[in-house]
UniProtKB/Swiss-Prot annotation:
Subcellular location: Secreted
Gene name linked to the record: IFNG
Protein's recorded name: Interferon gamma
Superkingdom per UniProt: Eukaryota
Keyword tags: Antiviral defense, Cytokine, Glycoprotein, Growth regulation, Pyrrolidone carboxylic acid, Secreted, Signal
InterPro entries: 4_helix_cytokine-like_core, Interferon_gamma
Length: 166
């Protein structure tokens, strides 16, 4: 490696690190702006305990935690939607919403679109209710753990294989 390559690599590292730090600093600034707007640092906010943090502590497995996180993300999206016309905090909400969705959906726009589509489904619509009930069996089957079924099939076929070889 020559001197120019090393200098270029070093400069890129400095640029990427500082931009990441800048993004993180902006993220925290926007949260502080929202805390100030909602007066969320006031001592009475602690009354009744945390809203989400205790629940998150109870769910340890990554797949289980995603379920709870999806409900929490849904809550924040609804909260941000309620204040979408508020120009004072609009930029802060947009920044945090964008970062939250990137973190939760790992930059997958199709997952994000599906998630947003789901939370916007009107529950009081009769046609939606009918479709939901019609799809209920398939949804329930999809909720069933498939790993146990595969294990049973595999052990069953192994058992047959041993029996046949005798």
């Amino acid at each position: 490696m020559n001197y120019t390559t090393i200098c270029l690599a070093f400069q890129l590292c400095v640029i990427f690190c500082s931009s990441g730090y800048y993004c993180q600093a902006m993220f925290f600034k926007e949260i502080e702006d929202l805390k100030e707007y909602f007066n969320a640092s006031n001592p009475d906010v602690a009354d009744g305990g945390p809203l989400f943090l205790d629940i998150l502590k109870n769910w340890r497995e990554e797949s289980d935690k995603k379920i709870i996180q999806s409900q929490i993300v849904s809550f924040y999206l609804k909260l941000f939607e309620n204040f979408k016309d508020n120009q004072i905090i609009q930029r802060s909400m947009d920044t945090i919403k964008e970062d939250m969705l990137v973190r939760f959906f790992n930059n997958s726009s199709s997952k994000l679109e599906d998630f947003l589509k789901l939370i916007r489904i009107p529950v009081n619509d009769l046609q939606v209710q009918r479709k939901a009930i019609n799809e209920l069996i398939k949804v329930m089957n999809d909720l069933s753990p498939r790993s146990n079924l595969r294990k049973r099939k595999r052990s069953h076929s192994l058992f047959r294989g041993r029996r046949a070889s005798k």
